[in-house]
Amino acid sequence: MKYNYTVLLSAFTMSVLYSVIYIHSFIIAALITMAFYFLFPYLIFALPLQIMMNKKPKRFSPLYLLYYLAAAFIANAIIFGMLQPSGQSLFQNTAFYLFAVLTALIYWIWDSVLLQKKEA
C-alpha cells in the first residue's frame, strides 16, 4: 500500500511543481490533469524499480537516486521524443533535463521517506 502512496504523492508533487514553473498559479483542473500525466510514467518506470530496490532498503541512498535518474532520463526521452516537434533536438531542450532530474528527485525523496529503512 505504501507503494501507492509514493506514486500518488510523487505525481501530485510534480503537478504542483509543474504548475508553479509553467502555469504560475494553482488551477485545480491543471493540478489534477498534470497529476495523471505524471502518474502513468511513475507506474511504468519507477514503481518496478522501487519494488526491486526495496529488497535491500536504504534510506536516501545516492545509488538509488542514480537508478531513478537513469529511469527518469529514459522515460522523459520517450515522452519528450513523442511530444516535441521533429525538428527540435531533444538534448537542447532544457525542460527535458529539468523534468528528468525533478521526477527522479521527487520520487527518490518520497520513496526514502515512506518506504526505505535506515541502513544498518
Swiss-Prot record:
Keyword Ribonucleoprotein belongs to the record: no
Annotated transmembrane regions: 3-23, 26-46, 63-83, 95-115
Coiled coil residues, start to end: none
UniProt keyword annotation of Protein biosynthesis present: no
Subcellular location: Cell membrane
Membrane topology: Multi-pass membrane protein
Keywords associated with the record: Cell membrane, Membrane, Transmembrane, Transmembrane helix
Record InterPro entries: UPF0715
One annotated Gene Ontology cellular component of this protein: plasma membrane
Sequence similarity: Belongs to the UPF0715 family.
The protein's name: UPF0715 membrane protein YwlA
Organism of provenance: Bacillus subtilis (strain 168)
